[in-house]
Amino acid sequence: MTILTHTLGFPRVGLRRELKKAQESYWAGNSTREALLAVGRELRARHWEQQKQAGIDLLPVGDFAWYDHVLTTSLLLGNVPARHQNNDGSVDIDTLFRIGRGRAPTGEPAAAAEMTKWFNTNYHYIVPEFSKGQQFRLTWTQLLEEVDEALALGHKIKPVLLGPVTYLWLGKVKGEPFDRLTLLTDILPVYQHVLAELAKRGVEWVQIDEPALVLELPQAWLDAFKPAYDALAGQVKLLLTTYFEGVTPNLDTIIALPVQGLHVDLIHGKDDVAELHQRLPVDWLLSAGLINGRNVWRADLTEKYAQINAIVGKRALWVASSCSLLHSPIDLSVETRLDTEVKSWFAFALQKCGELALLRDALNSGETAALEEWSAPIQARRHSRRVHNAAVEKRLAAITAQASQRENPYEVRAEAQRARFKLPAWPTTTIGSFPQTTEIRGLRLDFKKGNLDANNYRTGIAEHIKQAIIEQERLGLDVLVHGEAERNDMVEYFGEHLDGFVFTHNGWVQSYGSRCVKPPVVIGDISRPAPITVEWAKYAQSLTDKPVKGMLTGPVTILCWSFPREDVTRETIAKQIALALRDEVADLEAAGIGIIQIDEPALREGLPLRRSDWDAYLEWGVEAFRINAAVAKDETQIHTHMCYCEFNDIMDSIAALDADVITIETSRSDMELLESFEAFDYPNEIGPGVYDIHSPNVPSVEWIEALLKKAAQRIPAQRLWVNPDCGLKTRGWPETRAALANMVKAAHNLRQAK
């Protein structure tokens, strides 16, 4: 039984982000649809060939998406919201873009569908919308066309489909409430049709993704898998594919299904290979997800070999990436600026394909010399001085419970803060960033490229900060910010100033649509060699008598939005960051900054997939925040900002952060999010966002007033702040001025109405 290699998917965007550039050019009306489609064809052909040359035996087809693979599945099934449909009922690429982003070169603009995180990754998918009695039919044949493309190029392929149960699980009901699981019988005929078309083309194996099988699903959803797969059986061999967690808790459901193989994530799950081998039907193929698809680290292939070798020859076996390589950058070879030693520790998507080929060859032959040679750098890393900092490890080990406790409870602190700041009722502020103009971006780029010296760069940044303070004073805001002109990204900026991080030059990964991010990589113990934000905060404060907030990104968010180390726990990384930023809080305070905001937008999205694992995560996540903040004196006010849509299930932890003020995103929910805080009797101060910064629309004074009055019905007015939903980085100055002026006016009106 020869072992084969395959990947669950490959990055779509292209080494130079060609897809992003083609999409944005098309959306702007600067190129034709045909030009966009040609870029897609060229990228697919290139990526198939690259994987093949790297040693992948079965190439994934159907992993490419023009925006998002869940949205592609919606179009495949004919699930197009009425507001996005073409008049003639047809479906084209502009239909897809209207659903994803609200507008396209053709058709009428309409509200985009909701977007949310793909399981516990930093990739986002477009949430399917379901309505009672809706019909499904095969309307978008992208998968079949791409299969034809790959076959014409002579490739051995494995089409990829998002499975029917997971697809329904990921969606939301719109309009009249009903159980969306009842739609299963309606979508299965479309899946049957697609599988029949694939069988006609001579396809042997189809990868059918059901990552919902790693979750703690309600029993009704678990029970739905058997009839669903009974309906899909018989046309091609099905590789039931799971990832991001283990399958053991749901294995009884899985082994009853009429499929021919199972893929398991052996990186992020705790499944035991011997137990899987024992419990799976003897004629099933096992696809072992041994290479991490979500990180940038070179694998220790000697460990992977030992993990799987015991079952070689005992059942059909493939070796694979743990999940799609979508979550990894494409090619390490173009990272010419990385330090040689550090570079030897990494593997990007193409290198991970090579790792699979090395592992396959060793498992088939029993010869392991190549594995030992490949693994030597990652083994040597364990003893590198770049990784271990004895002072950091000693400080972390010495943390006591006292380190995460403020000096006094909120009630005492609030008195000290009121006496210090003497803020009016309904105090107004913003979340942190102001518009990142072309001038600001140009200034940073020129400095980075060496076209501008440090003195001129600092003079330019200082001028933008000064203008931000002048604008805020003109508007009449009560608590000001410096505007973050010096920051490119809220995580990257801190990573650049902390030891223990490195940055790639071209390590882009897709976040959603055309948006790509370049996460920092945590390579070792984290420390702060010098103050990071103090200079600019102190300068901004010198320009005004009003308080200026110091602005920090919190430890859990920095962790969640970086590629983490694999040799220590996430808890260890978060607490190391917290200790480094604790020193920043102390230095800001010593510089006269009386209000310090520690943003934690990722606290909720970092939750483990299984609820039974939540408590442990929340315990150390909250502790990391508190270690970061607790050095502050009573009279220093600690703010935090979070942009979630759901608080109910983590309110205990939100309260346990013990921030003096929390600002949250509420405008789009019409203040309904405050129900969680009201029901919990949240004791500290809250700034419910009063307008949506993602929209260029300027809210009226009356609209903001109405929202604030609604908020005051749930939270005592003396504990309410007035602020936008989020930072204003992506907005232009004209709508920013107009919206903030109306916000300040609404607050003044409410003060006078008292």
Curated annotation (Swiss-Prot):
The record places the active site at 694
Q: Name one GO molecular function term.
A: zinc ion binding
Q: Which Gene3D superfamilies match?
A: 3.20.20.210
Q: Please give the superkingdom of this protein's source.
A: Bacteria
InterPro entries associated with the record: Cbl-indep_Met_Synth_N (IPR013215), Cobalamin-indep_Met_synthase (IPR006276), Met_Synth_C/arc (IPR002629), UROD/MetE-like_sf (IPR038071)
Q: Which UniProt keywords apply?
A: Amino-acid biosynthesis, Metal-binding, Methionine biosynthesis, Methyltransferase, Repeat, Transferase, Zinc
Positions bound to L-methionine: 431-433, 484, 599
Which residues are L-homocysteine-binding?
A: 431-433, 484, 599
Q: Per its Swiss-Prot or TrEMBL entry, what cofactor is needed? A: Zn(2+)
Residues annotated for 5-methyltetrahydropteroyltri-L-glutamate binding in this entry: 17-20, 117, 515-516, 561, 605
Reaction catalysed?
A: 5-methyltetrahydropteroyltri-L-glutamate + L-homocysteine = tetrahydropteroyltri-L-glutamate + L-methionine
Which Enzyme Commission number(s) are listed?
2.1.1.14
Q: Which residues form a coiled coil?
A: none
On cofactor binding, the record's note says: Binds 1 zinc ion per subunit.
Q: Which NCBIfam families match?
A: met_syn_B12ind, PRK05222.1
What's the family? Belongs to the vitamin-B12 independent methionine synthase family.
Which HAMAP family does its entry note?
Meth_synth
Q: What does this protein do?
A: Catalyzes the transfer of a methyl group from 5-methyltetrahydrofolate to homocysteine resulting in methionine formation.
Q: Name the chain's protein.
A: 5-methyltetrahydropteroyltriglutamate--homocysteine methyltransferase
Species the sequence originates in:
Salmonella gallinarum (strain 287/91 / NCTC 13346)
**Top-level taxonomy:** Bacteria, Pseudomonadati, Pseudomonadota, Gammaproteobacteria, Enterobacterales
